[in-house]
C-alpha cells in the first residue's frame, strides 16, 4: 500500500517498489488494449518517451541483438567480453524470470551484473507518469525507455540491447547501434 503524506495544499503518494511494478504491469497490452486497439503501427510511443527523457538512447554506444533463438546467450556473452575488457557495460534483456529488475543490468566492479535499483524504477516511473498517461505506451515501451535512461545516467561505455518481439516495430529499434547481431531466424511458436 502506498504511503500518503499530507502537507498544506499538497498530497504526496509515495509508491513502493511493488506498487510501481503493479502499475507497470497494467501497461501490458493484454490489460490496456484489446483487438484492433492493441495493434502497434509505429514507434511513436517509444520516440515520445525517449524525447520526454532527453533522448537517452543517443548518449551511449550500443550493440543490438535480434533473432529467434540465442539472443540471451549472445547478449550475456558479449556483456562478459566487454566487461572483461574493462568497459562499463549495460545489458537489456527480456523477459525476466523472477524479478522485473533482471531485465536491466550493468556490469559491476566485482565482476557480476548489478540489477537496476528498486529506487530507480520507482523514481523513473513517478517522473514519467504524466507522459505515460498522455501517450499510453505499452509495458515494453516503458521498460525500454527505462533501460536507456538508466544506461545514460550510469554513463555506460556500451549497452547490449536485446530485441523483444523483434521486427521493425520493436521498441528497441530507436537506437542507432554500432553493431547489429542476428542470431538464427526461424518460425517461432
What residue ranges belong to the model's regions?
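A short, flexible beta-alpha/helix-coil linker loop
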Residues: 30-31, 186-188
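Short functional linear segments
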Residues: 12-67, 74-76, 80, 84
Amino acid at each position: 500500500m502506498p504511503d500518503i503524506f499530507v502537507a498544506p495544499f499538497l498530497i504526496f503518494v509515495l509508491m513502493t517498489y511493488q506498487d510501481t511494478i503493479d502499475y507497470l504491469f497494467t501497461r501490458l497490452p493484454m490489460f490496456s488494449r484489446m483487438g484492433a486497439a492493441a495493434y502497434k503501427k509505429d514507434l511513436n510511443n517509444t520516440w515520445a518517451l525517449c524525447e520526454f527523457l532527453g533522448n537517452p538512447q543517443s548518449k551511449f554506444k550500443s550493440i543490438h541483438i535480434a533473432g529467434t533463438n540465442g539472443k540471451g546467450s549472445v547478449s550475456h556473452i558479449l556483456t562478459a567480453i566487454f566487461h572483461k575488457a574493462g568497459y562499463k557495460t549495460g545489458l537489456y534483456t527480456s523477459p525476466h524470470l523472477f524479478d522485473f529488475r533482471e531485465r536491466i543490468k550493468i556490469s559491476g566492479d566485482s565482476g557480476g551484473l548489478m540489477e537496476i535499483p528498486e529506487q530507480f524504477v520507482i523514481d523513473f516511473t513517478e517522473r514519467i507518469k504524466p507522459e505515460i498517461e498522455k501517450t499510453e505506451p505499452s509495458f515494453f515501451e516503458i521498460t525500454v525507455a527505462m533501460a536507456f535512461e538508466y544506461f545514460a545516467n550510469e554513463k555506460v561505455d556500451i549497452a547490449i540491447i536485446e530485441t523483444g518481439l523483434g521486427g521493425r516495430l520493436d521498441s528497441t529499434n530507436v537506437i542507432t547501434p554500432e553493431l547489429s547481431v542476428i542470431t538464427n531466424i526461424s518460425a517461432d511458436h
